[in-house]
């Protein structure tokens, strides 16, 4: 399924089917917390957290695409991400956009 961050897809006309979302919440594990604590002292990228957030974004995108497929969509336009912390040890990621169905001229 085509997913774009733009409002339009060049050369395509479509009808809007509605909003679609994909959500995931990841928890930090004990080992990651130890490594993050050490990095916090010396500075630098916390690669385990970066990997966790990347994986969370991919899961959120796949869930959003699944919802769009269930609506009969051909593509998703205006895709965006939102994220936030839940308590101290959890990170929530949302992918959202507008599901569209291509129409012929």
Curated annotation (Swiss-Prot):
It holds the Pfam family YbjQ_1. Disulfide bonds: none annotated. It comes from the Bacteria. Belongs to the UPF0145 family. PANTHER family: UPF0145 PROTEIN SCO3412 (PTHR34068:SF2), UPF0145 PROTEIN YBJQ (PTHR34068). This is UPF0145 protein LSL_1614. It comes from Ligilactobacillus salivarius (strain UCC118) (Lactobacillus salivarius).
